[in-house]
Amino acid sequence: PTLWELSSPMFSLPMTEYAQGLFETVLEEYEDLELNPSGRDEFMTKRQNFPFTDPERSVATYEELKATKKEFPELRNLPAVGGFDFASTRDFIAVGALFKVDGDYVFKSHSFVRKEFVDRIYSYSKPNENVNGKRRFAPIRQWEDEGLLTVLDEPSMDAQHVVDWFVRMRDEEGYEFQTICGDGYKMREYLQPKFEEAGFEVSWNGKFEEPLGYRVEVIRNFRAIDAQLSTVIEDSFANQKINFGDNDMMRWYTNNVLRHLKKDGNVEYIKKEDVRRKTDGFKAFEAAMFKADLLNEVDTTDFYDNLGWFMG
C-alpha cells in the first residue's frame, strides 16, 4: 500500500478527504484478496492501472477440478435451483440441479447430445477407444454408459427433453426447485411453449404467481453474469467447495472454459475451442449459480446430531 501512490498520485501525502476515503476502500479490497484470490486480476487492472499480463487462463486448475469429485449427499427434498444451456439444438444441451450442502455447491447434471454430431466430431459409433491411432477427444459412449448423457438421433434436439428432465427431477427425485434459470436465447420460440404446456410459469422479470417447483426465470443478458459470478465461482473452485460427483463430463466441460479478462477488468467465460471443446454443462452450472442465493444451506452434521438425540 505504501507504493500505491506510484500508480495513483492522489494517494500521495497529504491526501484529500476524497482520496483518503478511496484509499480505505482500495485497502479493504486489497485485504479481501487473502480470502478471495480470484479478484487479483481485476484489482491490478482497476485499482493499480496495471493490466494483468496473462488475460486468459482456465477457470479452474487441474487440482481444483480433481477436488470436485466427491460423493453426493442425499438430495431428496432439498431446495434446488435448476440451470440449463440450450444455445444449440444441433450438438449439445445441458441441464442441472444445484444444491448447497455443508458449504459445498453440489451440482447434478445431465446432457443431451445429437448422434450425427458426436458421430462426426467424436467418432461415437466407432467401436474402438482409439481412432486412427489417437485417443478419442471425448469418450461419449463411456459417458452414455455411465448415464451422464443421452444420445438423440434427431435432426434437431427437441426442447421437450429439457422440460421432461426437470419434471422428472421434481416429481420422481423430490428436488424442491426454487426456480429454474437459463438464457433467453431461443426461449420464446422453443422452450417457453414447452415449459408452459407442462404447467410452468416463464418469467422475464423475476416475478412469479406460480408456486415453487413451477417457476422458470429467464436470464435476459447471459453474457453479463460472467463478471457478476466470477468471484464466487472461482473462489469456490479454489476453496474446494464445488461437488460435481462422479461426473467426469462436468469436469471436461469446465476444463474447456477459458477465463478471459477484458480490458475493462471484467471477466468473461469463453470456449477454448469452438467445435470440439464444449462448455454447455458449465454454462448450465453458471445459470443455476445466478440464483444460488435462493438456496437455504443444509448442514447435515446438525441433522444427524439431532437425529441421534431424537432416537436416543
Give the positions of each predicted feature.
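Non-catalytic, compositionally simple segments
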Residues: P1-V81, R90-F92, H110-V113, I121-E154, ...
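Flexible loop/turn segments at secondary-structure boundaries
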Residues: D54-R57, S88-I93, G103-Y105, K115-D119, ...
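Acidic, metal-ligating active-site segments
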Residues: R90-Y105, G281, A287-A288
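Metal-dependent DNA phosphodiester-chemistry modules and their immediately adjacent helices/loops
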Residues: P1, A198, S203-D299
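Short glycine-rich phosphate-binding loop at a beta-alpha junction
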Residues: G174-M187, L191
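An acidic- and aromatic-residue-enriched active-site/binding cleft used to recognize and process polar
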Residues: D85-T89, K100, F112, G182-M187, ...
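Short, surface-exposed connector motifs at secondary-structure boundaries
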Residues: R170-T179, L212-R215
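Acidic, low-complexity intrinsically disordered tails
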Residues: F303-G312
